[in-house]
Structure formats: structure tokens, C-alpha cells
Amino acid sequence: MKLKRAYSPGEVLNMKIPRYEFTGDWQASIGNPAKSGVWIIWGASGNGKSSFVMQLAKYLCGFGRVIYDSLEESTGLSFQMSLKRHKMDEVRKRLVILDRESMDQLEERLQRRGSPGIVIIDSFQYSGLNYKTYKEFKERHPKKLFIFISHAEGSHPAGRSARKVEYDADVKIMVSCFNAWCKSRFMEKPGEPYVIWEEGAAKTLKDDNMEDYLNGMGE
């Protein structure tokens, strides 16, 4: 078996690794992330997860074309209302919405020349992936950024496979109390909470265990 090339520290430091230059609240929460890899976002119902994902998708459209594969919610009324509430028509030229497109169909789409570089998959549980097929999928597309939305079980993604993805992901984001709590490999410490909805966040008591949770998030 042919071995892969080995590198010196200097060679790695001199590599030009593409990254996004985030600003403002997004940079404070996530840093300046690589343009490829995996993120995972999870949270209990009613805490602002859907709104956060829409806000994130809209922000990422400022950097390039984004696929949103709505596996769980489809393109029904609630999804339509969310698009309207966040004025997603403003990024209509860069946001590609897929109505429950299977992972096989999505894979075929991603193999096309010029396919979008950012892919939001909502949700991991509806994708049908397990940890093995997830790893194979992401390794076939090393230049893409995949953002998986997940159900929550306690303070972690729901299910064994999603929990493993939490540990594998470059950016892990838990949505709670209308805040997005981020832990990113592109920052030396957990980022500042991203406030999804100020009024809702102000009315919700702060979780006293949040600091302990952040310390226990997947590395």
C-alpha cells in the first residue's frame, strides 16, 4: 500500500487553507472557519433553532451559494413562514432550497461542476445516515462545508450517530433559550453566545449549567 506524503510543521504552516472572514457577532461566536468540513447544530423545540439556522444560512449566502435540503419540514407552510420572517428572498440568487432530496440525489447534485460549496442538511435524523455512511459521504466531498441540523437529547444531539458527529465536527452549536452556544475549532475557547432573538433571550432564565455543558462539548 502506498503511503501518503508526510509533512514538516513548516510545510503545514505555509499551506493556504481557504477560510471565511466572518465579522461582528458571527466572528465572536464562531471565529473565521475553514471553507470545508462539518458543523452540527442542535437544540430542543421552541428554543430558536429554526430561526438561527435561517439567520446563519442568510449570512453564509454573503460568501457563496448555499444548498438547504429541507428533509424534515419539506417546503410546507411553517418553512414558508420562516423564509418570509427572515426575508430570505433577499438572497434568492444564492439560496438553493431542496424539497426532501434524498442523500443519493444530493450526492449526484454535488458532483456537478460549480455546485454550491455550502450544504445545510435538515435534519441528520431524516438523512438516513449512520456514522459510517456520514464519514464516507463527507470524505467524498472534501471541499464542501456540511452543516447538519439535529434533534436534541438533553444537551447533546439525539442518537448515537449524531452524538459521534458532534465529536467529529469542526463547529458544534447548541441552541438554547434563544441563544446559540458555539464551540469552534477555529477559536481557542468557546465563542460568545449568538443572540437569536433578544426579547426571547431576555425573558428566559440563564441555564446555570451552561458553562459546565460547554466544557463537556465534543472536542
Question: PLM ranges: what are they?
Answer:
Residues 35-104:
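Conserved P-loop
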Residues 1-16:
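Charged, amphipathic alpha-helical linker segments immediately N-terminal to NTP-binding catalytic cores
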Residues 17-33:
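Pre-Walker A adenine-sensing motif
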